[in-house]
Each structure stands twice: as C-alpha cells, then as structure tokens.
Amino acid sequence: MLNYKKYKRFETIKLKDRTWPDNEITKAPIWCSVDLRDGNQALINPMTVEEKIEFFNLLVKLGFKEIEIGFPSASQIEYDFLRRLVDENLIPDDVMVQVLTQARPHLIKRTFESLKNVKKAIVHIYNSTSVLQRDVVFNMSKEEIKEIAVEGTKLVKEYAKDFEGEILLEYSPESFTEIGRAHV
C-alpha cells in the first residue's frame, strides 16, 4: 500500500522456549481489493462500466496490486468491464486482476474468454460445500462435491496452458463454515 512503514512496530517480548510468536512481519502483505466483485448482477441499480472503471482507477491509485474485478461469466456488465480494462490498456503492468467463477465448465470457459490478452490474472474458482446445499440443492455425495472442485481445478490448469499471460489459481469452498468438523 502507500506507506506501510508509517507506523512504528511494537517491541517484541523475548521469552525462552517460544518459537512462532517471535517471528516478525517485516514487509507489507499483499492486499487484494474485492470491492468490485460479484453481486453487481443482484443490485437494483448496478454500477455502470464507467463507474466500475472510475472505482478501479481509485483502487490502483490507492496502491492495490491485486484487484478482484468481478464475475464476468455471471454478468454482462462485469464481462464488458473487464474487456474495457484490457482493450483500453487500463491495467498497470504491476497490477494483477482477479476474477471469480463457480467451478463449472461453461463458466470457466466464459471466464477465460473474458481474460483474453490480460497479462496477469488470478482465476478464483469456488463450489458449495455445505451439507444442506450438497444434500438439498445438488443431491450429491461428499465425494461428488469434491470432484467438482478437482475437475474445476483441472479445467483452469488446462486453459492456463494455452493462455498467453500469467494465470494463478485460487480455490475457495463456499459455505465452508456450515460443513462442521464431522464432514471435513
């Protein structure tokens, strides 16, 4: 971010036989803004592409180096927004954009179509893992739900092979907190 050295660090207390508490963070973490992602399609008055560009430029000015910009396979506005960023060369070389998509083949394909000519991107896939959704919505076993994640990951890796830019993969289990320890 802008100036992570602005604040003085606290002095650590050295205690014998202690290991990890003595570790220190000596550089700023990587912050990823998710302010532009997912949900635009659900708003009564969604942001326009122009508003999203203005917001993106502000995040860049603030110093964000990773910006999750949307769910281009779920919303035409978010798809168009990403394409404008790329076509108008608005993504700085030191900024990596991130896109979100469910771990479903047709959505992953559409996501990679939206990323054409992006230099660096994180493809963030997810699938639901909660017992309720697994049983009621998907009518699938725990193993079948795991397979969705595995197949989605394989598909992202396959598309990434032919992608001209740099692709990083991020996976998240949706509704993970609803699983419970017995179901992990």
Predicted regions and their residues:
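Hydrophobic or amphipathic alpha-helical targeting/insertion segments
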Residues: 105-131, 143
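Catalytic domains of carbohydrate-active enzymes, especially glycoside hydrolases
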Residues: 51-72
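N-terminal small/glycine-rich loop or linker at the start of catalytic domains
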Residues: 20-45, 124-138, 166-170
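Conserved small/polar residues in nucleotide/adenosyl-binding loops
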Residues: 182-184
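Hydrophobic alpha-helical hairpins/lids featuring a short glycine-rich hinge
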Residues: 112, 130-158, 169-178
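Glycine-rich, proline-tolerant flexible connector loops at the mouths of alpha/beta enzymes
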Residues: 65-91, 95, 99-100, 127-137, ...
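Short, well-ordered coil/turn segments that N-cap beta-strands
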Residues: 26-29, 63-65, 91-97, 119-121, ...
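Acidic (Asp/Glu)-rich catalytic clusters
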Residues: 83-92, 110-121, 154-164
